[in-house]
Amino acid sequence: PSIDLEKNPEPALQVRRYAYSSKMPIAILTDFEELAIYDTRIKPTPKDTAATARIEYLTLDKYVNHFEDLFNKISWDAVDLGKFNTYYETAKEKRGTATVDNDILQMIEDWRLLLAKDIALHNNEIDEFNLTGCVQKIIDRILFLRIAEDKEIEELFTLQKQIEKGRSDYLYDNLKKLFDLAGAKYNAGLFDSDQFLNALKIQDQTLSSIINALYYPECQYEFSVIPVEILGSIYERFLGKIIRFTRKTKNGHGVEVIEKPEVKKAGGVYYTPTYIVKYIVQQTIGKKIEGKTPAEISSMRFLDPACGSGSFLVGTYQYLLDYHLDYYQEHNLSEAEKTGKIYKDSRTQTYKLSVEEKRRILTNNIYGVDIDAQAVEVTKLSLFLKLLENEGRALGKGGQVDLFRRSDIQQRILPGMSGNIKCGNSLIGSDYYDDKDLLHLGLQEQRKVNVFDWKEAFASILNQGGFDCVIGNPPYVFARDSKEKGMNKEEKEYYYLNYKLAKYQINLYQLFIERSSYLMKEDGIFSFIIPNNWLTINTSIDFRK
């Protein structure tokens, strides 16, 4: 072999970066003559040697004597039977653990505070609400473009090159131009023009430190292999905190980042584990589309009325993508290929859904609502990244479009999702303001309540009978917790007047169930994760009936 796997750190660092970013616990590096097994929960660094985090190392002459041990650990059968996982658990006892999601969460939380401090200090006109939105959008945009680079959809170092340009101009001005080009390319809403963003003053040092943190050697992540589901779990926790002003300064404000009151009361953010999402999706969407053709599925609508960062919608979308690909390969493959629904990847020699088909499925089938504007943007971002998953060069330079050749843009890659993913309070409609006494509510209170009219937002779907499936993990908020979780007296009165299940001590998850029953078709399928106390408590008698 031309590379010494025992001593050369480069192959080890590469495999560890990929595995760590994919949240894989173990990685195997081999050229057959040498074999090394690494614990990839240990974060790689540029200073690591080839031996760092290495659990085992063998050469060809030792394979025979260790054959049984190797077969029991890393053979196909061992992996299939779960013995590989057992080996990982054994190794876990000997070493500390680290996870890519915790690391990235800490990284973007640091960015949030850094950006918030800078913007609040140098932009006297901005308020807390718009500060939060602007910080979120900047982070989303930078992270999206960096992921696109590693997926080879964008040219590598596109973001970092803006720092070099910034030496003769303000870095933020260069980034705004880049965002405009990205908006023309992706059409996702993610890069839409924003008056507050355009007017901001941000110091070059702040932005350059964020961008440089996304590139080697400061960054050890391989963004192309980080699953969208992991990014969703990161953002779910990220959204559990808010930016608050602390003091007035000469030119702006001081800031802090604190937990939302409802998150603090609950003891933290709880992200729905991926395996639970998969199970619920299989038992609802899976049952609903079983045996159906793509044409039949195209008229179906699937909803999460409290979508958060989008875990259930991403899970639903993935299930639909897998189902369609399997269907096309099993039913008239040549026709599906001829009509552009699938294509054969020249590198892997496997069939994939075309971007156009993935766009069609996303816009036809996936719907969500959330009261938190930042959560809505994260849901869209997660769905867009899922659409772009495994695309790579097919969309990058020499492929469909190139970010800096705007005249070459034939079709924007991503669909607009404003008609599918909406921001609002799933439980409170505009009739909340019918009582004249409520007109005293200020802008901040109106933003918190965030009324939402289902009949207006999804008129065509409801006129056709409603959604085919409703799934999710709604908030559990008791009326007795209203002070800490922000449910005001007017909201409680509204619930009592408009929901049959709003009796005694209100719990919002029951109201979500009642609301969902009116949003579904008569033959629709419904599945929520809810606490089991409704089985025994007296206040849930009507709910049990």
Where do the protein language model's features map onto the residues?
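Preference for the N-terminal adenyl/adenosyl cofactor-binding alpha/beta module
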Residues: 33, 68-321, 365-378, 424-430, ...
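Short, polar/flexible loop-turn hinges at active-site or ligand-entry regions and domain interfaces
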Residues: 2-7, 25-26, 44, 91-95, ...
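SAM-dependent methyltransferase catalytic region
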Residues: 15, 158, 221, 246-544
